[in-house]
Regions:
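Short pre-functional
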Residues: 1-16, 142-146
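Short, basic (Lys/Arg/His-rich) helix/loop patches that form interaction surfaces
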Residues: 8, 69, 77, 81-156, ...
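Short, surface-exposed helix/turn micro-motifs that flank interaction/cofactor sites
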Residues: 16-17, 155
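Conserved tyrosine-mediated DNA breakage-rejoining catalytic core shared by Y-recombinases
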Residues: 17-84
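Structural detector for helix-capping/boundary residues
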Residues: 18-21, 139, 167
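Catalytic-site neighborhood detector that most strongly recognizes the C-terminal catalytic loop/helix
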Residues: 23, 39, 151, 158-183
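Residue-level detector of conserved, well-ordered beta-strand and adjacent loop positions
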Residues: 36, 72, 96-98, 170
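Intrinsically disordered, low-complexity basic tails/linkers immediately adjacent to helix-turn-helix/homeobox/MYB/SANT
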Residues: 184-189
């Protein structure tokens, strides 16, 4: 699930609801996931179903909209392995709790906190560095922008508007002045 956020910039509520039928996972090369629903966790008191999660359309999109997201070979391999190793939930979801239910934020948050203690130094654990799983999505978007992927493409893949993308991530682009100078010099001849 965390790999989907890191490699594909999925929101946690999109990742927990990812179904095998939403995925194109070729033997080699890039794949694709097709996102059409999200499962936000809002609490039983606030859902139509009385469950912890409610099935909704994509954030800030019409209910019937599908967002295709190309995924790199690294994520394709991880998802293929995950399905082979763990199978899928009865409804086809890739990720599930031990009882088959939707993965709760408290569950993946607990795993995330434990992973931070293993992977980071004590000082880093005390810092905001990778403080929450949603930060993986921000890392993905920042990585794409720093790799030179055009903002409209990044926005489309991440499910943002270009306006939101540039407002939130404009300062994450490192070395952009030097790159801009080189491109302008190249165009000037």
């Amino acid at each position: 699930m965390f790999a989907c956020m890191y490699y594909g910039a999925l929101r946690p509520a999109e990742a927990v609801n990812l179904h095998k039928s939403d995925c194109e996972l070729p033997d080699a090369g890039w794949g694709r996931v097709y996102l059409s629903e999200t499962t936000p966790e809002v609490g039983k008191r606030y859902t139509d179903s009385g469950e912890l999660h409610d099935l909704k359309g994509l954030k800030h999109r019409p209910d019937d909209e599908v967002r295709p997201v190309p995924i790199p070979p690294e994520l394709v391999r991880l998802l293929r392995w995950h399905v082979a190793e763990f199978g899928v939930a009865p409804d086809g979801r890739l990720f599930r709790q031990s009882n088959g239910g939707v993965v709760n934020s408290s569950t993946y948050g607990q795993v995330w906190r434990a992973a931070r203690h293993i992977a980071l130094t004590p000082a880093q654990v005390e810092s905001p560095l990778a403080g929450r799983p949603d930060d993986l999505r921000h890392v993905a978007v920042s990585l794409w922008l720093n790799a030179g992927v055009p903002a409209p493409t990044v926005a489309r893949r991440a499910g943002h508007s270009v306006d939101v993308l540039l407002r939130v991530y404009a300062n994450c682009i490192d070395g952009d002045e030097e790159i801009a100078n080189e491109r302008i010099s190249g165009s000037l001849g």
